[in-house]
C-alpha cells in the first residue's frame, strides 16, 4: 500500500529513477493506493538527458507493490519493490518501454497500453 511520502521506483524509460508520492487520487477518504491506482508524485532522482527533471510533478499509475494483490482464485502476487509508470496530462505513459513485470489487474483499470509496453505480464 502506498501513502503520502512513500518512495517508489519508476518502471519506465522516462528518465526518472525515484519518485515520492505527494497525493493519492480518488476521493477525500482515499488514504492508501493499491495496484492500478493513480497517484501524484514528485521526481526525487532523475538521470541527465531524460524526459523528466528532478522536482517535476506528474501523475503515475502503480504497477508493482510489496503488499501485492490477491487474485479471485486465492493466489497472491507480491513484488520486492514498489514501482509505477509516469503519466502525462492525457493519462498516457511518458516512457516508451516498461521494465519488469506488471500484473493483469491493470487491464480492468483500463491501462492496456502499459501492459502492451511491459516485458512480462503476470
UniProtKB/Swiss-Prot annotation:
<comment type="similarity">
    <text>Belongs to the universal ribosomal protein uL14 family.</text>
</comment>
<dbReference type="GO" id="GO:0006412">
    <property type="term" value="P:translation"/>
</dbReference>
<dbReference type="Pfam" id="PF00238">
    <property type="entry name" value="Ribosomal_L14"/>
</dbReference>
<dbReference type="GO" id="GO:0070180">
    <property type="term" value="F:large ribosomal subunit rRNA binding"/>
</dbReference>
<keyword id="KW-0689">Ribosomal protein</keyword>
<keyword id="KW-0694">RNA-binding</keyword>
<keyword id="KW-0699">rRNA-binding</keyword>
<dbReference type="GO" id="GO:0003735">
    <property type="term" value="F:structural constituent of ribosome"/>
</dbReference>
<dbReference type="InterPro" id="IPR005745">
    <property type="entry name" value="Ribosomal_uL14_bac-type"/>
</dbReference>
<dbReference type="InterPro" id="IPR019972">
    <property type="entry name" value="Ribosomal_uL14_CS"/>
</dbReference>
<protein>
    <recommendedName>
        <fullName>Large ribosomal subunit protein uL14</fullName>
    </recommendedName>
</protein>
<dbReference type="InterPro" id="IPR000218">
    <property type="entry name" value="Ribosomal_uL14"/>
</dbReference>
<dbReference type="GO" id="GO:0022625">
    <property type="term" value="C:cytosolic large ribosomal subunit"/>
</dbReference>
<comment type="subunit">
    <text>Part of the 50S ribosomal subunit. Forms a cluster with proteins L3 and L19. In the 70S ribosome, L14 and L19 interact and together make contacts with the 16S rRNA in bridges B5 and B8.</text>
</comment>
<keyword id="KW-0687">Ribonucleoprotein</keyword>
<dbReference type="InterPro" id="IPR036853">
    <property type="entry name" value="Ribosomal_uL14_sf"/>
</dbReference>
<comment type="function">
    <text>Binds to 23S rRNA. Forms part of two intersubunit bridges in the 70S ribosome.</text>
</comment>
Amino acid at each position: 500500500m502506498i501513502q503520502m511520502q512513500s518512495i517508489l521506483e519508476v518502471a519506465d524509460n522516462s528518465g526518472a529513477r525515484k519518485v515520492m508520492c505527494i497525493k493519492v487520487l480518488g476521493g477525500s477518504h482515499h488514504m492508501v493506493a493499491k495496484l492500478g491506482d493513480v497517484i501524484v508524485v514528485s521526481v526525487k532522482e532523475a538521470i541527465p538527458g531524460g524526459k523528466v527533471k528532478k522536482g517535476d510533478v506528474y501523475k503515475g499509475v502503480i504497477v508493482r507493490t510489496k503488499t501485492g494483490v490477491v487474485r479471485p482464485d486465492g493466489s497472491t502476487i507480491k513484488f520486492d519493490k514498489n514501482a509505477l509508470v509516469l503519466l502525462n496530462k492525457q493519462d498516457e505513459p511518458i516512457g516508451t518501454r516498461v521494465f519488469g513485470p506488471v500484473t493483469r489487474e491493470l487491464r480492468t483499470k483500463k491501462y492496456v497500453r502499459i501492459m502492451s509496453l511491459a516485458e512480462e505480464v503476470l
